[in-house]
């Protein structure tokens, strides 16, 4: 996994790999790190969710984006509707262009 070797840089903790991406992907990574990493797992931004129990992680924290790929449309659906069926994710945690940027970031890096 190429992202595993990425080094965090700057005060935002964005990896050098992400820093070379278009501005919307960089912004999406920053927003994901700030607003989503408390519950979701994604190694490229150092997000691990809240539980260390791998068997419980997805049920408690939501999708593990290290292994689950999502399309931008699916990400936007989850953001607008508080996740998928039965989810406990806050609805509209990001909106407008911010939501689009998170969707662009996740569709590029999730499931890699």
Model feature map: region roles:
Residues 28, 102:
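Hydrophobic pocket/interface hotspot
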Residues 5-8:
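C-terminal motif of bacterial Sec signal peptides marking the signal peptidase cleavage site
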Residues 1-2:
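Sec-dependent N-terminal signal peptides
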Residues 11-16, 21-23, 29-64, 81-88, ...:
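Periplasmic/extracellular electron-transfer cofactor-ligation site
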Residues 56-77, 88-101, 109:
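Electron-transfer interface patches adjacent to heme c in soluble/periplasmic c-type cytochromes
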